[in-house]
Swiss-Prot record:
Keywords of this entry: Cytoplasm, DNA-binding, Sigma factor, Transcription, Transcription regulation
Coiled coil segments of this chain: none
DNA-binding annotation, residue ranges on this chain: 293-312
Gene3D superfamilies named in the record: RNA Polymerase Primary Sigma Factor (1.10.601.10), Winged helix-like DNA-binding domain superfamily/Winged helix DNA-binding domain (1.10.10.10)
Natural source organism: Pseudomonas aeruginosa (strain ATCC 15692 / DSM 22644 / CIP 104116 / JCM 14847 / LMG 12228 / 1C / PRS 101 / PAO1)
Protein name in UniProt: RNA polymerase sigma factor RpoS
Amino acid sequence: MALKKEGPEFDHDDEVLLLEPGIMLDESSADEQPSPRATPKATTSFSSKQHKHIDYTRALDATQLYLNEIGFSPLLTPEEEVHFARLAQKGDPAGRKRMIESNLRLVVKIARRYVNRGLSLLDLIEEGNLGLIRAVEKFDPERGFRFSTYATWWIRQTIERAIMNQTRTIRLPIHVVKELNVYLRAARELTHKLDHEPSPEEIANLLEKPVAEVKRMLGLNERVTSVDVSLGPDSDKTLLDTLTDDRPTDPCELLQDDDLSESIDQWLTELTDKQREVVIRRFGLRGHESSTLEEVGQEIGLTRERVRQIQVEALKRLREILEKNGLSSDALFQ
């Protein structure tokens, strides 16, 4: 099948971020198309001098290198797009690869809209690329519309989902995330129209929703901080270390706990080595964590059933020790 090599035609919705190979990205030129007269020779000439202009210690280096690399992937004409989409639909790896590589700049264009939302640009691009791959897998070229229009929805969805999941401590169900995005989009729309941040009442009026429901949904967007987070890069203390325990502690209870611990240690000495080892590991004594029968067996080299038998023997022996000392075993073995 002969393919035309004419330049691609895009409508407004099909615009992509065009980046000439080897050209540095800045805010003023990021969305400009490359000159059709650019030649590999000019690119090579720039390459020989680029070390004078790029500071490789900057965090943007990786992003710039990625953008330069994807600039070598040519865009597809409408005819080529249909051709390679059909190949991808049939499971052809080459067709799938060409569809993905030719639309990587579309992902960058969309990802840049979500900068300063909690994820770096590279992370946003990575998530968007997952959406692009999904779009290639689901796209039907016989439907008659351009791939970029179809892929935009998948790319935006994966990016927005990643922002919601990765920037919050508590993850929300996906249906709640989708509903919350409706409220957040309404808030952004009102922010552009008004001279102030919209109130829940204004958002409720726009969406025709109850004010209480708007407040509830927006409350889900509040950041939650872990109490284990460090107070600073040079500090070993966490937020938990600065919180006071408001629960009253009875000194008598502390003494009773200490006495009980000493008594248990004494009683354990009257068990056999195997019995003592099983009880300590099963019930989390002497600094160990509680373990299952199978875990204890793996740790001491016995079968699960043998560990169970030793545990039964050990507990029976402990009850006898308690009764001999005039104590009830009920409280200890509840």
